[in-house]
Regions:
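Positively charged n-region of N-terminal signal peptides that target proteins for export
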Residues: 1-4
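Beta-strand/loop edge motif enriched in small/polar residues
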Residues: 22-467
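Bacterial N-terminal signal peptides
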Residues: 7-17
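General helical structural elements
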Residues: 6-7, 511
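A sequence-level detector for low-complexity, Ser/Thr- and acidic-rich stretches
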Residues: 467-598
Length: 598
């Protein structure tokens, strides 16, 4: 009896903090005003809940949101962020936000095979699509529901922040080719922040983008039924550090890339830019006959670099041609709008030759396939610097809860060299390796695969660091506090000497001054960086763990998550640079700082 009681106490103490919530709040009505969901409650979605009327739904770190099961997939429960509304879901590395099924006790009681127990999360925005009308009705929601409409003309649209989030056991097959995914994004703009998300054991795709320009980092698609990542209708966002792993018996494409609907000459073309992906299939010898690599269809383009694609039952890459259409992916390749480079192609059940791994373009909408295998010609071309039929030597691939999953490259892995340097554009992190992971395991701790015992217990660290030597920082330049008029512009200059590039942290702090009792701070500073007359970077509202870490290392004061302070991290060659600070719609106090990271 004493042993039983002690075991119960230990189990409670070891449980996630979210299990200690005392109240269950059943959500039956749409969110039409600014609302906060707290970690002291568990929220149970009774139906599809729409955040609408321009409202912001804030979800505290550690909060659990559950979806009630429905007999008919048409009625699947979901959280939908409508156009004009925002989600402010900012978990942390130690207290992620969890979306899951009602029956999930967060104790591991549900298995990987229990998929589709509720709908999922849908975010809709006003960014552009390539449909004829420039709008769409998102899959999985009745076309008669106006709150399911997405699209518009604002590529910078902001639907909020979605960070450190797990989405478990989601997905609903409403009809053929009509599904709710783990995370569905329709027309979401690049003003939105999406990073550190794990979609686990879903009944359809992990992620699907319908048009839009949203950028994303640190995405995990784990053991889902269909594709890891899927885009349609002219998606043009950027992505880095994407990881996908298939179940031994489930999973379709590593990535399914569609461009537009008929006619397939709709613009803008789908042309996302992706760096540092690790995509593992069901196993080259698995029984899952649907396990495929990449497929490019319709008029999609896209640039993919520093990718590891490995362990799929069938082919590595297939590129569609449609001679009956004015545009197709083969034409995007010929135009230079589609590229795969500096990537490792590992083991595939289709075979070891290039013609087996990279299948000939196939005609799916009429006409005959061309005589030339464009796919092989492109991927094997020397300028692409791809490594073909090469074992990436990952530390561990596992599809069971044995803590054997370790997607980091092992000693001697070819992924440790041969990478392409990402653009220095303010979004991409500087990397010198192929794949989503270096020696650091950024998935550890916050993700579902970590919480449920798939992932190794190896120490976690943050790979989102500039590739620089040493570990110290110094304040390189600091302006005095200044007052900016409503229409004022502040210019500050600095010079980097020497012969080597340097990484700098630049801050325009307005809202961050509130904690020091400074009244009248600049509410929304905008920071731009120039070399000569050339603008090379800009930032409005900062985000990202990299900034948090480098600010701490520099010894400066931390910024509140979600504040509208502006921050840039750039690796710059020696020379002179100018910064410009302006304010959006107001005047106020602001501090300008430049730190050199050494």
């Amino acid at each position: 009896m004493k042993r039983s009681l002690l075991s119960s106490i230990l189990a409670l103490l070891a449980a996630p903090a979210a299990l200690l919530a005392q109240n269950t709040v059943v959500v039956t009505a749409n969110v039409t005003a600014n609302t906060t969901w707290t970690r002291t409650n568990t929220y149970l979605l009774e139906t599809k809940i729409y955040v609408t009327n321009g409202a912001t739904l804030t979800i505290e770190p550690g909060t659990v949101i559950k979806g009630r099961p429905k007999a008919n997939p048409v009625d699947a429960t979901a959280l939908v962020i409508a156009r004009g509304a925002k989600i402010n879901a900012q978990g942390t590395a130690t207290t992620p936000i969890i979306f899951t099924a009602e029956s999930d006790l967060l104790s591991g009681n549900l298995t990987q095979a229990e998929r589709g127990l509720w709908g999922g999360v849908v975010i809709l925005g006003r960014s552009r699509l390539n449909t004829a009308s420039g709008q769409g009705n998102v899959e999985g929601i009745p076309t008669t529901e106006p709150l399911g409409t997405y699209g518009g003309t604002d590529d910078d649209d902001n639907s909020g922040v979605f960070r450190y989030v797990q989405i478990r056991h989601s997905g609903a097959i409403v009809a053929a080719n009509v599904e709710l995914n783990g995370l569905t994004m329709g027309g979401v703009g690049r003003g939105t922040t999406i990073e550190y998300v794990d979609v686990y054991a879903g009944n359809d795709d992990g992620y699907e983008w319908f048009g839009g320009t949203v950028n994303s980092k640190y995405l995990i698609s784990s053991y889902n039924d269909d594709d890891n990542f899927d885009w349609d209708e002219g998606f043009r966002g950027k992505g880095q550090f994407w990881f996908g792993v298939g179940a031994s018996d489930k999973g379709n494409q590593a990535m399914e890339m569609d461009g537009g609907t008929s006619p397939e000459d709709g613009q803008p073309y789908a042309m996302p830019e992706l760096y540092n992906l690790t995509l593992n299939g069901s196993g080259a010898t698995s029984t899952n006959t649907a396990s495929n690599g990449l497929i490019f269809r319709d008029n999609t383009g896209g640039k993919i670099y520093n990718m590891i694609l490995h362990d799929y039952r069938n082919y590595a890459v297939r590129l569609e041609t449609e001679s009956a259409q004015a545009q197709d992916s083969a034409k995007r390749l010929a135009a230079g709008d589609l590229a795969i480079g500096n990537s490792i192609f590992g083991t595939f059940g289709a075979g070891t030759t290039t013609t087996q791994m990279f299948t000939a373009p196939n005609a799916t909408s009429g006409g005959a396939a061309p005589a030339t295998n464009y796919t092989v010609a492109h991927i094997t071309a020397a300028p692409q610097a791809n490594q073909i039929n090469t074992n990436p030597l990952l530390t561990g691939i596992s599809r069971t809860r044995n803590k054997g999953l370790d997607p980091r490259p092992a000693t001697g892995s070819p992924a440790l060299s041969g990478a392409r340097t990402p653009p220095a554009d303010g979004f991409f992190s500087v990397t010198n390796y192929i794949g989503a992971f270096s020696s650091a395991n950024w998935a550890k701790g916050w993700s579902a695969i970590s919480a449920l015992g798939y992932l190794t217990d190896a120490d976690a660290a943050n790979p989102d660091q500039p590739v620089v030597s040493g570990s110290t920082t110094k304040l390189y330049a600091l302006s005095n506090r200044l007052t900016l008029a409503a229409d004022g512009i502040f210019f500050g200059g600095f010079t980097l000497d020497g012969t080597q590039s340097k990484t700098v942290l630049i801050r325009a702090v307005g809202p961050g001054l509130a904690g020091f009792g400074i009244p009248g701070f600049l509410a929304d500073p905008v920071l731009k960086l120039f070399q000569g007359t050339n603008e090379i970077a800009s930032n409005d509202d900062w985000s990202g763990q990299q900034i948090v870490d480098l600010t701490r290392n520099a010894g400066s004061f931390a910024l509140t998550a979600g504040s509208r302070d502006a921050v840039l991290i750039r690796t710059l060659a020696p020379g002179s640079y100018t910064t410009q600070i302006t304010g959006k719609g107001g005047a106020g106090e602001v501090i300008f700082e430049v730190y050199e990271i050494k």
